[in-house]
Amino acid sequence: MALPDRKPMLQVEGIKKYFPIEKGLFRRVVGQVKAVDDVELEVRQGETLGLVGESGCGKTTLGRCIVRAIEPTEGRILLRLDGDRMTDLLQLGKQDLRAQRRHMQMIFQDPYSSLDPRKTILDIVAQPLRANRMGSSSEIEDRVRDLVELVGLNVESLIRYPHAFSGGQRQRIGIARALATNPRIVIADEPVSALDVSVQAQILNLLQDLQAEFDLTMLFIAHDLSVVEHVSDRVAVMYVGKIVETAETEELYLHPLHPYTEALLSAVSVPDPDIGQDHMILPGEAANPADLPSGCYFHPRCRYAEDRCRTETPAWTEARPGHFARCHFAGELELTGVDA
């Protein structure tokens, strides 16, 4: 369920992340990899925004730019820290940024490499609390106990090390760590992609329960639209560094406006053997972010492409109420969706 009346918690404006291509002994810059290219996003308070796209489209890079794990090349990242005041995180110095990091936390993709194998679960979950001096030792330990129980683990787990836990249990520990500081926004970077399907469902249900209980604001990054469908209020689709479509979840699944979204939706399995599915196979590979095509980046793979798609860059258009797409023919093409 979308929350149109909520104030934005996060606004990403014109974010770019270009990596230089260097060549020769003197490392001369000969080009750029446009990993994130002029992205605009808004995540409202208490909302889960799903960010989807193929591997290599720039989703994770964008998430890391938002928390300033890597520095963007250009743009603004505005986070609501106090009342109605939005703070541009890119204008903060190192000391101020460190003080504000507790307001933005990440849940990482790999539950095996994201936990320090030399530390107990108590120390892992307590680390952000200690780093931000959020209480005495006893208060921090009490907080960690509450968090561990909240994510479905026993308090006896606190003295154990990560190797003693399964992948799903490790991801629960990662979630507890992310929630420790009561962040304003959580960036969940493919939090279930490394897990078995049955465990995925458990973690998704946990995230939904936590979001409902604590009114969490979350950017949920994934490559699987069937996963995003169950946790997101709205969905943004990313292709080669650009957002190509965004809408409320049900609206986007039923009425896609961009051919790339239609192709992604065709891969979503329908749990009914009587319903035939026409899986759309996109020709070729995704565009090279170091050598992007002219016009619409998607035109070499698009079955609907016309001459203008090869020469003109499509504008960001609101073709239906609250439903935006970057396509010359948004709202004109009859694209196939699925029931959300």
Annotate the PLM regions.
Residues 2-8, 22-27, 32, 86, ...:
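Short catalytic/signature loops enriched in Gly
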Residues 84-88, 138-156, 265:
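Conserved ABC ATPase "signature" region
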